[in-house]
Amino acid sequence: MQEFKQHTGLAVPLDSANVDTDQIIPKQFLQRVSKLGFGQNLFHDWRFLDEAGTQPNPEFVLNFPRYKGASILLARENFGNGSSREHAPWALADYGLKAVIAPSFADIFYGNSLNNGLLVVRLKDDEVDALFKLVEANEGQNITVDLEAKEVRAADYCFKFEIDDFRRYCIMNGLDNIGLTLQHADAIDAYEAKQPVWL
């Protein structure tokens, strides 16, 4: 997992509420065991006009030339609802997205995203509205997500957000559950060495 302290990138506005995990990454693409390769099928049923994924939908926002290379996704309320699948944050990250900003997220998706190094930021409705208007009105508009300061900045806007201190520490230091455990490897080994040997 990569460290995340601050990121500035092009933002793409997905103006849909209640986007579920099957829309993020449809179930027919969940056969992989690696985290890589899911990005090509992100929002498959919206991004493509055909099942094979060879005909891009020119009316879907991620296909607009002005948003090519976007690394921050703006979304609406209840993003990531539906069935629990870690493949959803994997697909978003593999596509190149570093953060998702929305008024609210489904709880399981929120946890899965942070556990996998995808920063999900909750802002107030009016703050998200302001960012949507800014990005839609200004081609090439970047947004900065500053995890150290717990701020989202763009143009003259500066919005504060909250995140659990433990999750913030893990993401800033690039630690997933395994990495966090390995930080305590010496203490674990010392504890194990003190245990009686059973035959």
From Swiss-Prot:
GO terms for cellular component: 3-isopropylmalate dehydratase complex. Heterodimer of LeuC and LeuD. PANTHER family: 3-ISOPROPYLMALATE DEHYDRATASE SMALL SUBUNIT, 3-ISOPROPYLMALATE DEHYDRATASE SMALL SUBUNIT 2-RELATED-RELATED. Pfam families: Aconitase_C. It comes from the Bacteria. This is 3-isopropylmalate dehydratase small subunit. The keyword Lyase applies. Keywords: Amino-acid biosynthesis, Branched-chain amino acid biosynthesis, Leucine biosynthesis, Lyase. InterPro entries: 3-IsopropMal_deHydase_ssu (IPR004431), Aconitase/3IPM_dehydase_swvl (IPR015928), AconitaseA/IPMdHydase_ssu_swvl (IPR000573), IPMI_Swivel (IPR033940), LeuD (IPR050075). Belongs to the LeuD family. LeuD type 1 subfamily. GO terms for molecular function: 3-isopropylmalate dehydratase activity.
